[in-house]
Amino acid sequence: MCISRIAFGKVFKKSDSPFKDNRFSEKILGPDFAFLLKAHGEAMPYFKSLKREIISVATFDGLKLDGLFVACPQTSSDTVILVHGYNSSPEGDFPVITRYYLENGFNVLCTNNRGGKNGDGDDITFGIFERLDTALWVDEIAKRHPDGNIVLHGVSLGGATVCMMSELTLKNVCAVISDCAYTSVRDEFDYTTKFVAGFTPRRSLEKMYRIFEKTHGLSVDEFTPLKAVANAKYPILFIHGKEDRFIPVSMAYELFDACPAKKELYIVEGAGHAASCVRNPAEYASRTLEFIKGCKR
């Protein structure tokens, strides 16, 4: 149980990013990791120069989460909510994406998720509670722009989160963009442990899941992206890098096949994990914007 508890603390709690070790990053995220860091680094001065407004929400369990709202240079009532990945932040995932949305008529709200680098709280629930947190921001934006469209765009854990939100009834949401989402926590950990260690330590994982259930009062299997998209209420664009080593591209096909709503699948040739937006940025922008255009209310 001791090993499982340590693993629980490493995986489901806020911690320093494991991707600081470049050798580990190259193995699990692929050679695109350095390319991704470079692209975001080049876009960072622009991102930091943006005038932001903090929009805070209070979660059901007492956390205060801050979102960074950036108004479109041209007056707009349409907003994209960007949901970052595991142990990350808006600065870590969205310097590139933010710009093309702002330049194409959208306000942008970047969330700081629970357990993320800048987020309140220490617990990471892989979309289970994050979906409810993000729904609070949806409500805030809908109050500000009651006639506007809201797009949910998430990357990695954020992609899984917006998939899990697709079955919720949400004000003004017209489309979901899911970039490199996993099908479930269980599927992802089975895959990742085998890829990294060469085998899947099922007994240890099961003990870790039991600790999660005891801590949070629900199972990791109760809410999953795969289950949620099967009841999707909104159009979904599924994006995935073909060379993703962290979350396999096969999961994008599973999510796509399970979704009964309007949908598209965009597989980015040569892209590693979370790197689709920088591997072919012009095509990524055009595909997402065209999809959203066809979904506006």
Model-derived regions, located:
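Short alpha-helix in the alpha/beta-hydrolase fold that links the catalytic acid
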Residues: Y234, P248-D257
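Catalytic histidine-centered segment of alpha/beta-hydrolase-like enzymes
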Residues: A271-A282
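Short beta-strand/loop motif that positions the catalytic acidic residue
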Residues: N231-K233, F238-H240, D244
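Hydrolase active-site cap/lid region
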Residues: M164-L218, I267
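Catalytic nucleophile-loop/oxyanion-hole region of alpha/beta-hydrolase
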Residues: P90, R114-H145, N149
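Conserved alpha/beta-hydrolase
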Residues: Y100-D120
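The serine-hydrolase catalytic nucleophile loop
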Residues: Y86-Y100, N113
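An N-terminal hydrophobic leader/cap segment in hydrolases
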Residues: M1-A58
